[in-house]
Swiss-Prot record:
Chief place of localization: membrane
Stated name of the protein: Undecaprenyl-diphosphatase
Top EC group: hydrolase
Organism placement in taxonomy: Bacteria, Bacillati, Actinomycetota, Actinomycetes, Mycobacteriales
Catalytic activity line of the entry: di-trans,octa-cis-undecaprenyl diphosphate + H2O = di-trans,octa-cis-undecaprenyl phosphate + phosphate + H(+)
Length: 282
């Protein structure tokens, strides 16, 4: 197999910035990495670099939700021993576990397809445009009348299944989980928060699993050195922390249509570039 091309520092910085800025927004960070790397660097950053740089944004969401995580974990552990402590946070701990199962199973069995075939830009930009309709529909029909006390294990299953759609670059993890939450009648901020909590174990496992491949990719994609991966992770962390804080404030007063418009604009523009041969799909 031909050795993967090495990444320059400029590529690392740009792609890590794209990762950090878009990871928590419903616009697909993996899709943006594929688009940016193809347009500006004539190559694909690869699924492995994407997964490892996600460790930076993973750290960001863990820091942001640290108090929630400690509270939920504490309640879950106490609830396992004492029934009287089985409150909302105890149940939420179980919901995160339940909702994580689908993506762990699919990610394990279809990892090779995720790393290669579905990274074709035609697939990415089509998903970017098509799933915009799903987000718009969820925003339109969602009642947003249910709060955290009314969250159930069935909601966890549905949102967990929706999270598996994020395995396809261009869909968006937050876009799929927030949309699922809105379809279930959850309020917009709860849908986002639960989706972020659900992503923590999945993204962490994905990043660790892909760490060796980022140095020596087993499929198409550029390779990075240890220092480059460290810098990429730090950049993604700083920008990711800013992005998650901004998004949760934004969703309190604004709807998802802003992101729908952005996705359609970028996706349509990319379809034109692909159709005219200006940008190569692979």
């Amino acid at each position: 197999m031909t050795a993967a091309p090495a990444m320059s520092w400029w590529q690392v910085i740009v792609l890590a910035a794209a990762q950090g800025l878009t990871e928590f927004l419903p616009v697909s960070s993996s899709g943006h990495l594929a688009i940016v790397s193809r347009i500006f660097f004539s190559g694909d950053a690869g699924a492995s670099f994407t997964a490892v740089s996600q460790l930076g944004t993973e750290a960001a969401v863990v820091i942001y939700f640290a108090r929630d995580i400690v509270r939920i974990l504490s309640a879950w552990l106490h609830g396992l021993v004492v029934k009287a402590h089985r409150n909302t946070d105890y149940r939420l701990g179980w919901y995160v576990i339940i909702g994580t199962i689908p993506i762990c199973i699919l990610g394990l069995f279809f990892k090779d397809d995720i790393r290669s075939g579905v990274r074709n830009l035609w697939v990415v930009v089509t998903a970017l445009v098509v799933f915009s309709g799903v987000i718009a529909l969820a925003e339109y029909v969602g009642r947003q009348s249910r709060h955290i006390e009314r969250l159930t294990w069935r909601d966890a299953v549905v949102v967990g299944i929706a999270q598996t759609l994020a395995l396809v670059p261009g869909v968006s993890r937050s876009g799929s989980t927030i949309s699922a939450g809105l379809f279930l009648g959850l309020d917009r901020e709860l849908a986002a928060r639960f989706g972020f909590l659900l992503a923590i174990p999945a993204v962490f496992a994905s990043g660790l699993f892909s760490l060796p491949d980022a140095f020596h990719p087993v499929t198409e994609g550029m390779s990075a050195t240890g220092p480059q991966l460290l810098v990429a992770t730090l950049i993604a962390f700083v920008l990711g922390l800013t992005a998650v804080a901004w998004l949760l404030r934004f969703l309190v007063r604004h709807n998802m249509y802003w992101f729908v418009g952005y996705r359609v604009l970028v996706g349509t523009g990319m379809l034109v570039l692909l159709a005219t041969g200006t940008v190569a799909a692979t």
